[in-house]
């Protein structure tokens, strides 16, 4: 229970009495009840919890890896008294909106955890937690945090990474795989404590078209903290290794995910070329690069059709299956489609700034939602080369059409992921 979470108004409320009333109501039902509360922003207010009995509350420090509240004096959300003697858990948030993309702070997460372990607040630290808004991404980071309580002494990510790769794939003894993960650990998973972006490095393929595209969701605070070429090289090594090793389920998933990230990086390079060509009034280069961008987008869509984890079909099917009749199923499908695109009506999407908050780089969405947007935008730009005014596109109207559809998407793999990744990498990078 989280009173005043994200914008609740505590004005005129006696916080001490409110906290005691909530706890009293819980104890009346179950004398052994423990109040689990999220630490986010200014909540839980110290005045609400400091008079409650220790042992009756467990505080989840939601964002321990970025803005810890357990009492770290270096945190922007520093609480001098921590959680006022209440039990708490060191939690990693990592992902906002369930966005698809690789991101993490391997060493920083380790450093922060052991900093807490060595602080005066360790006596009330009861464990770790995973508090991501969306799971099914970046398994390496969840594995790392889950392993922390079992290691008494601080360690470096290099020694841990080797054991992680062996545990994940089996004793494959392939240097290309290990080298690929070293590149990833130093790039997308090597964000420092200074990097405050909320969630993954977002794919330009999912962005609303413009000549100044940077991030996709309005809340991402995305930063350029790594060399995209390291990700592309890591994907190349994984693709090469896929010809040499016996691919278990984990390897197949990672091969698709790493190749997906590399293709997204390449798409951003091509996007920059499009902008440069347009500003230089180079029609030939503009036509070439826009076609290449759209081809890359469709190639990404096709590759992801080989892995159910990256297919919108399963998402929509799960939503429809919740309905007890056709009308309910249609409504749940609409909700599922809206949640990963517009987030709501025009007001929520445009004025609320939450469109694409939970965007997904998935098969089906790429081809049917993102491709038409980019194609229409490029066609509008192309027309200006002939002296025509720039057409004002109503992107929300385009987006809404997709949310109202009920076309059926496949939810089972449409091909061999190893072969699809190999083909995609060759088509995009020519290697």
Q: Where is each model-derived feature located?
A:
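Polar/charged alpha-helical tracts
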Residues: 47-50, 111, 233, 272, ...
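Polar/charged low-complexity regulatory segments
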Residues: 222-249
């Amino acid at each position: 229970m989280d009173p005043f979470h994200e914008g609740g108004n505590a004005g005129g409320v006696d916080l001490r009495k409110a906290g005691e009333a909530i706890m009293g109501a819980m104890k009346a039902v179950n004398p052994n009840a423990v109040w689990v509360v999220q630490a986010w922003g200014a909540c839980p207010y110290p005045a609400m919890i400091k008079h409650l009995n220790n042992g009756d509350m467990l505080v989840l420090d939601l964002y321990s890896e970025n803005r810890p509240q357990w009492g770290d004096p270096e945190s922007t959300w520093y609480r001098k008294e921590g959680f006022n003697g209440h039990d708490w858990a060191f939690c990693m948030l990592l992902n906002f909106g369930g966005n698809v993309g690789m991101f993490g702070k391997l060493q920083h997460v380790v450093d922060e955890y052991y900093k807490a372990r060595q602080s005066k607040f360790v006596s009330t630290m009861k464990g770790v937690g995973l508090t991501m808004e969306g799971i099914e991404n970046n398994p390496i980071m969840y594995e790392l945090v889950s392993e922390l309580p079992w290691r008494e002494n601080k360690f470096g990510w290099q020694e841990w990474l080797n054991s992680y790769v062996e545990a994940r794939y089996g004793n494959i003894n392939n240097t290309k795989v290990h080298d690929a993960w070293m590149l990833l650990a130093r790039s997308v998973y090597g964000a420092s404590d200074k990097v405050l972006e909320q969630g993954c490095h977002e794919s330009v393929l999912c962005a609303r078209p413009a000549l100044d595209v940077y991030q996709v969701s309005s809340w991402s605070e995305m930063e350029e903290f790594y060399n995209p070429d390291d990700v592309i090289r890591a994907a190349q090594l994984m693709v090469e290794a896929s010809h040499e090793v016996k691919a278990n389920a984990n390897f197949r998933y990672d091969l698709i995910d790493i190749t997906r990230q590399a293709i997204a990086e390449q798409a951003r390079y091509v996007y920059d070329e499009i902008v440069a060509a347009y500003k230089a009034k180079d029609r030939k280069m503009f036509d070439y690069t826009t076609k290449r961008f759209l081809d890359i987008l469709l190639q990404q869509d096709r590759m992801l059709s080989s892995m159910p984890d990256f297919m919108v079909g399963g998402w929509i099917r799960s939503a429809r299956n919740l309905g007890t009749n056709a009308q309910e199923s249609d409504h749940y499908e609409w909700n599922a489609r809206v949640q990963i695109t517009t987030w709501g009506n025009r007001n929520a999407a445009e004025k609320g700034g939450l469109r694409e908050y939970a965007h997904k780089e998935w098969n089906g969405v790429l081809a049917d939602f993102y491709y038409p947007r980019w194609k229409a935008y490029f066609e509008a730009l192309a027309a200006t080369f002939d002296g025509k005014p720039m057409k004002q596109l109503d992107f929300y109207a385009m987006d809404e059409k997709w949310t109202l559809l009920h076309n059926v998407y496949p939810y089972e793999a449409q091909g061999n992921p190893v072969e699809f990744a190999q083909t995609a990498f060759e088509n995009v990078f020519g290697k």
